[in-house]
């Protein structure tokens, strides 16, 4: 149970405790809150009355009787506040407004030039305004913005220190987005870390304290949860497994400037380019697919995926990714590995190739305790993670009543 250094601190902590209990366990009765928290029934009654008056929670009928009157049940009011969530990826932007119960009120998906941060920030602002207009929502009801972005992210400073795939160096992204959105608080996290958090909260990672989400996209990265918390290393940059070396001689050039990285061999762009180079022109013609316009989706979902060359390529990519996963398993000894990102759409063919390599390359004692699965989160795991990060921050606030948080912003445009 939380404690405070004085009565004011204790009152605030008790309020946070009750609010979080209702959020996580609702519908729940007042007496159950008192039992779970150790607070007196009178304290719970006062706090609940305050939360009801603020519109943060609501009464939702009656529970079962244990002999007396049936207790009134409480749950979080999902429309008490909203979150603006963003996923940035090379050439793509995904934005959405969520309520407090992870329902998407409206969303946008855009293709754009992501080389210039100002272009991305402006598109974020335009998307925000379009979503507000579509939902007819008061923008002040949106309390926080969460952003999932590829690269080395100093989340405590809101700065993208380096993103090889975006071509960004030292971009104060939190401050730039906050300014464009009229002062809305913004939290930026690495895209793989965000996805790992989404898996912990909403996906296959529920109930697991030690998991690794491997994002198989344009870039390749890992979000690592150790004892239930994101593990970032000394500066928060842990998980850049796409820049581990696969080929030491004459490897392809990576966006980071080095040769032979896993990402340069197994990233989405690399796989598509290898498919263009290895699948014969007559095969493209046979399946009615333009070689120049080939996408990963063609290799995952179209009949082209069944041609001999595509099958061989997918098997090889699966083996390489399996080597990468085996290294992660031997190094971190996680409970579960979750594969996500566009390459995971290759499905069971990819998964079986990965599992075969892990079985061949990991120590038996470590191997037998790990599960390897493809993410089952509908939509975008990084977007859901951006939402979860923002939600965490909303529920750490001492007070809120559905109006814009007046935060003391530490992020500055100067970085």
Task: Give, region by region, the residue ranges found by the protein language model.
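Short glycine-rich anion-binding loops that position phosphate/pyrophosphate groups of nucleotides
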Residues: 150-152, 217-219, 343
């Amino acid at each position: 149970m939380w404690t405070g250094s004085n009565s004011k601190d204790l009152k605030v902590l008790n309020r946070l405790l009750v609010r979080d209990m209702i959020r996580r366990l609702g519908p729940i009765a007042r007496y159950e809150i008192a039992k779970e928290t150790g607070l007196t029934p009178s304290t719970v009654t006062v706090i609940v009355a305050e939360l009801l008056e603020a519109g943060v929670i609501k009464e939702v009928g009656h529970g079962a009787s244990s002999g007396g009157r049936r207790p009134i049940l409480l749950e979080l009011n999902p429309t008490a506040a909203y979150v603006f969530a963003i996923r940035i990826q090379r050439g793509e932007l995904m934005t959405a407004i969520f309520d407090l119960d992870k329902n998407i009120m409206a969303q946008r998906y855009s293709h754009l030039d992501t080389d210039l941060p100002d272009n991305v920030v402006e598109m974020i602002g335009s998307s925000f305004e379009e979503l507000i207009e579509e939902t007819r929502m008061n923008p002040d009801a949106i309390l926080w913005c969460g952003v999932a972005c590829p690269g080395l992210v100093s989340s405590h400073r809101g700065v993208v220190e380096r993103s090889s795939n975006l071509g960004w160096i030292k971009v104060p992204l939190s401050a730039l987005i906050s300014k464009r959105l009229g002062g809305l608080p913004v939290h930026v996290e690495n895209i793989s870390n965000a996805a790992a958090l989404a898996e912990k909260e909403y996906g296959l990672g529920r109930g697991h304290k030690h998991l690794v989400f491997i994002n198989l996209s344009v870039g390749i990265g890992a979000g690592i949860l150790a004892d239930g918390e994101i593990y970032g290393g000394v500066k928060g940059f842990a998980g850049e497994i796409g820049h581990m070396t696969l080929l030491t001689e004459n490897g392809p050039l990576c966006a980071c400037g080095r040769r032979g990285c896993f990402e340069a061999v197994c990233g989405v762009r690399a796989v598509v380019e290898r498919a263009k180079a290895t699948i014969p022109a007559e095969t493209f013609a046979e399946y009615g697919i333009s070689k120049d316009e080939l996408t990963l989706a063609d290799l995952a979902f179209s009949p082209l995926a069944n041609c001999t060359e595509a099958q061989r390529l997918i098997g090889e990519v699966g083996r390489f990714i399996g080597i990468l996963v085996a290294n992660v398993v031997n190094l971190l000894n996680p409970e579960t590995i979750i594969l996500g990102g566009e390459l995971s759409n290759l499905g069971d063919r990819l998964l079986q190739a990965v599992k075969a390599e892990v079985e061949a390359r990991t120590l038996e004692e470590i191997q037998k305790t790990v599960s390897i699965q493809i993410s089952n989160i509908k939509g975008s795991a990084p977007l859901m993670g951006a939402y979860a990060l923002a939600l965490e921050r909303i529920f750490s606030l001492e007070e809120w009543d559905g109006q814009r948080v007046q935060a003391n912003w530490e992020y500055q445009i100067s970085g």
